[in-house]
Swiss-Prot record:
C-type lectin domain segment(s): 805-862
Listed name of the protein: Versican core protein
Region span, GAG-alpha (glucosaminoglycan attachment domain): 141-233
Pfam families: EGF, Lectin_C, Xlink
Glycosylation site positions: N123, N204, N332, S407, N425, N477, N513, N563, N696
Assembly mode: Interacts with FBLN1.
The encoding gene: VCAN
Cross-referenced PROSITE patterns: ASX_HYDROXYL, C_TYPE_LECTIN_2, EGF_1, EGF_2, EGF_3, EGF_CA, LINK_1, LINK_2
Start and end residues of each stretch annotated as Glucosaminoglycan attachment domain, similar to chondroitin sulfate attachment site in collagen type IX: 234-525
């Protein structure tokens, strides 16, 4: 309801301000008045009376006798605006009793103008009883406004086509919308079996379900037919994801030299890209995993389990002295990141002493519960060289060229058999989880020249942990392993691969035979070579009590230095499989990552390293031993309680890691060789981020006990940006996904409520009071006869027939006279002609009288 003079009972929700009040959304059963709008009057409203007046029914009949009807409230209001004035109450069509007042008279509405209403009760509720007697207001339409209203002729009966009118409103609606909205994808719903019987009886009806549905996807016209039989629909090509919350797509590109052109992937052809149809998550049918193997040895392996872990190895061969590494893009669904084509990282390595062949083995590990079998295989590039040190490694991120994408939900995930794709679809993700995978470059030489010897699994070091780098060097076996750990953050609703660097700081220390336990575990152990070359081993894992499912992987590296003279290290294998752990009561649920070096002598030694790595920034120290004896190196991460890194939004275009120093001491039982410290500086191009030394962002902290050698990975939740309440001057902080919003108290503005503005700008004072602004406050200087904080209370009233406005009393005289007579009349009343001093006073005078009025000669019109 509108209000101009707030008073008791008329405050509403405007806190004493003039305006339109509201009670909010109310129940339809509640009763209130109604506000109507009338534009113009298309007829005449006239007044009827009789000596004995009329009841409501008599008034309606009397209007009918006049070829009219009872007027509505809107029609009477429009007539009043046109100057209709009648100081007699009369019936209206809604059984209310009203009369219009155009000329203010004391005996007619108390001197007020408008349409006056007669109520039954003092609280202005209820209309008079219908048997009460009043005059009547009738309405008669003008003849020129009459219009001919034609009635539609009933159509002929269509009994011969009883089902012709039965159509699917969804299809009719989509048929109208699709030509105008080419980006809408239509989803057809099957009719139930009950409707099929009715459709058979309708020979003339159109079968909507068999009509090809036209789809428009990015402007391309696709026609697909939705089968009528639900069983036929289930025969479409689909991939089932049992116990999977987030299906991940894997796509890769293989690069081989001319000698190995026969190595092909069965899932990288363009034709098979078109074969990808749909995903059916709820069902638990076995899914087929197409694993890339050598075409001469392996074709395809079907994993016989509903949920399984897959180790997929991407291979890249080259004949030159530099290592080629496939670019990998990671999907960070929580933060938009610009194009990552220009993000590169360089690692300078010592020159190779002899020409050698290298290949990159990137292992992708996904977990699903329960797990029974794992098939792993990796070919080995044979070469007669005895020492292998790659010159340099230059990983480059290429957009959608070679990409490896997965996520690490603990409940399990699958890898789609169709590799090439250009989009990433994520289903429901309840919270952000973390998965780490390594980029591993492996250099190995064997004594055979045959390329078909695939009886040994390459040593692919797999670590799961915070973003960091660990370099294990085994001079004796000439096997160099480098690992770069990268974190993936997933967020629902985002698409496409993006890149985001994440920080990690750690000190590395390793006493003898210690075991490091992480929040996610990878186990690598020996894969026993069978007599039949080229056949992978199946590693069994027994299910445990499914009290709580935790994706656990373990790592175990077996070293055998007995074949030192052969120029290689045998007995190295990898097995990766998830396990199920049942947590005990009262214990913290942690999983373990066991890394043990057996067959070699180890000495307690600690080194320290602190580095920050981003996506594809595999920067690592390359330690060149000074002796040809068999050295061993063991290390484990150790917490650095003084350093935490936060990754927040900023304008800096680069993140430069501080100069770091890694000292590694390689000892042997016969000869102790010391590797000189290696100093390196890392610079990672990350345009939308900056690195600050703070503890506000999510970090991974690793607590290490030197004696028990057991660490726990603690996942710290996101920061509460409103914890310190950055809002000033009493503002309220509300956190958002990326920042916070301050809601300021009256009188302040700005992002942090730091600006003090004029509180009197909104004119909070009432009844013509003057507002005085202060520091975070204001004060109202009231006119005479008004009190209150906002001068809203009137303590004095005017005489009968006078109207009060802003402390002054006004009286309207309807009869016309000259200016001199008007001035004398005002003097006789102890007043003077009105002086219009404000726009509000002008509006008040216009409301009091609808005719022209004399005012003071020295005044101007507002």
């Amino acid at each position: 309801y509108p209000i101009r003079a707030p008073r008791v009972g008329c405050y509403g929700d405007m806190m004493g301000k003039a305006g339109v009040r509201t009670y909010g959304f109310r129940s339809p059963q509640e009763t209130y008045d109604v506000y109507c709008y009338v534009d113009h009057l298309d007829g005449d409203v006239f007044h009827l009376t009789a000596p004995s007046k009329f009841t409501f029914e008599e008034a309606a009949k009397e209007c009918e006798n006049q070829d009219a009807r009872l007027a509505t409230v809107g029609e009477l209001q429009a007539a009043w605006r046109n100057g209709f004035d009648q100081c007699d109450y009369g019936w209206l069509s809604d059984a209310s009793v009203r009369h219009p007042v155009t000329v203010a008279r004391a005996q007619c509405g108390g001197g007020l103008l408008g349409v006056r209403t007669l109520y039954r009760f003092e609280n202005q509720t209820g209309f008079p009883p219908p048997d009460s007697r009043f005059d009547a207001y009738c309405f008669k339409r003008r003849m020129s406004d009459l219009s001919v209203i034609g009635h539609p002729i009933d159509s002929e009966s269509k009994e011969d086509e009883p089902c012709s009118e039965e159509t699917d409103p969804v299809h009719d609606l989509m048929a109208e919308i699709l030509p105008e909205f080419p980006d809408i994808i239509e989803i057809d719903l099957y009719h139930s079996e009950e409707n099929e019987e009715e459709e058979e009886e309708c020979a003339n009806a159109t079968d909507v379900t068999t009509t090809p549905s036209v789809q428009y996807i990015n402007g391309k016209h696709l026609v697909t037919t939705v089968p009528k039989d639900p069983e036929a629909a289930s025969g479409t090509i689909s991939t089932n994801f049992p116990q999977t919350m987030e299906p991940a797509k894997l796509w890769s590109r293989q690069e081989v030299n001319p000698e190995r052109q026969e190595i092909e992937s069965e899932t990288t052809s363009e034709e098979q890209i078109q074969e990808e149809k749909s995903f059916e998550s709820p069902q638990n049918s076995p899914a087929t995993e197409q694993t890339i193997f050598d075409s001469q040895t392996f074709t395809e392996t079907e994993l016989k389990t509903t949920g399984y872990s897959v180790l997929t190895t991407k291979k890249t061969y080259s004949d030159d002295k530099e290592m080629e590494e496939e670019g990998t893009s990671l999907a960070n669904m929580s933060t938009p990141v610009p194009d990552a084509n220009g993000v590169e990282s360089f690692t300078t390595l010592p020159e190779a002493t002899e020409k050698s062949h290298f290949f990159l083995a990137t292992a992708l590990v996904t977990e699903s519960i329960p797990a029974e079998h794992v098939v792993t295989d990796s070919p080995i590039k044979e070469e007669e060289s005895t020492k292998h040190f790659p010159k340099g490694m230059r990983p480059t991120i290429q957009e959608l060229d070679t990409e490896l994408l997965f996520s690490g939900l603990g409940s399990g995930e699958e890898v789609l058999p169709t590799l090439p794709t250009k989009s990433v679809n994520f289903t429901e993700v309840e919270q952000i989880r973390n998965t780490f995978y390594p980029h591993t470059s492996q250099v190995e030489s064997t004594s055979s020249d045959k390329l078909e010897d695939f009886n040994r699994m390459e040593n692919v070091a797999k670590e799961v942990g915070p973003l960091g780098s660990q370099t294990d060097i085994f001079e004796g076996n000439e096997s160099v392993t480098s690992t770069t750990l990268i974190e993936i953050l997933s967020d629902p609703g985002a698409e496409g691969p993006t890149v985001a660097p994440l920080p990690f700081f750690a000190n590395i220390g390793h006493p003898q035979n210690q075991t490091l336990r992480w929040a996610e575990e990878i186990q690598t152990s020996k894969l026993e070579p069978s007599e039949e070359d080229g056949k992978p081993e199946l590693l069994e894992e027994t299910e445990a009590s499914p009290t709580e499912f935790i994706a656990v992987e373990g790592t175990e590296i077996l070293q055998d230095f007995q074949n030192k003279t052969d120029g290689q290290v045998s007995g190295e294998a990898i097995k990766m499989f998830p396990t199920i752990k049942t947590p005990e009561a009262g214990t913290v649920i942690t999983t373990a990552n066991e890394i043990k070096l057996e067959g070699a002598t180890q000495w307690p030694h600690s080194t320290s390293a602190s580095a920050t790595y981003g996506i594809e920034a595999g920067v690592m120290p390359w330690l060149s031993p000074q002796t040809s004896e068999r050295p061993t190196l063991s290390s484990s991460p150790e917490i650095n309680p003084e350093t935490q890194a936060a990754l927040i939004r900023g304008q800096d275009s680069t993140v430069a890691a501080s100069e770091q120093q890694v000292t590694a001491r390689i000892l042997d039982t016969n000869d102790q060789a010391t590797v000189s410290p290696v100093e390196f500086n890392t610079e990672v191009a990350t345009p939308p981020f900056s690195l600050l030394e703070t503890s506000n962002e999510t970090d991974f902290l690793i607590g290490i006990n030197e004696e028990s050698v057991e660490g726990t990975a603690i996942y710290l939740p996101g920061p509460d940006r409103c914890k310190m309440n950055p809002c000033l001057n009493g503002g309220t902080c509300y956190p958002t996904e990326t920042s916070y919003v301050c809601t300021c108290v009256p009188g302040y503005s700005g992002d942090q409520c730091e600006l003090d503005f004029d509180e009197c700008h909104s004119n909070p004072c009432r009844n013509g009071a003057t507002c005085a602004d202060g520091f975070n406050t204001f004060r109202c200087l009231c006119l005479p006869s008004y009190v209150g904080a906002l001068c809203e209370q009137d303590i004095e009233t005017c005489d009968y027939g006078w109207h009060k406005f802003q402390g002054q009393c006004y009286k309207y005289f309807a009869h016309r006279r000259t200016w001199d007579a008007a001035e004398r009349e005002c003097r006789l009343q102890g007043a003077h002609l009105t002086s219009i001093l404000s726009h509000e006073e002008q509006m008040f005078v216009n409301r009091v009288g609808h005719d022209y009025q004399w005012i003071g000669l020295n005044d101007k019109m507002f």
